[in-house]
Amino acid sequence: MLRRIALLPLAAAALVVCGPNPKSRELRLWSDNYAFYITMDPMPPRALEPITYRVVVQDKKTRQPIETGEGRIFATSADRANTSDGFKKEKELGTYSGRLFFATTGDWAAAIQFRRDKDPRLPLERVDWIQTVHTASEPGT
């Protein structure tokens, strides 16, 4: 009996190590010149809660992080509700963040626009995806 109790912490540690890989929840998108690695918190996104998107941007060919870029994240629902935010530079190399607030559940057409420098003459590159938004959490949970 004591042997089984002693093995419980090892079993719990094994579950943590073998748990879901954070990379498996990462959305990966590519434009002509950039690779975007997108995570969101909380996951899955829920209506009526602010969702923070963290976006790592790399040069598609060299895999180097893009440090001086600018961009935005935005989404539109089927009933034309909109949400958007400009990117804020984070401490990590090539990492930006933006927050979206989804007013309704369902599928939203989401997109990122981004350019390497803050030069308005440079074109904005765009990637699109469908973001499924789940029902809001119950109050107090």
Spans of model-derived segments:
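Sec-dependent bacterial lipoprotein signal peptides
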Residues: 1-16
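N-terminal soluble domains immediately following signal/targeting peptides that reside
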Residues: 18-141
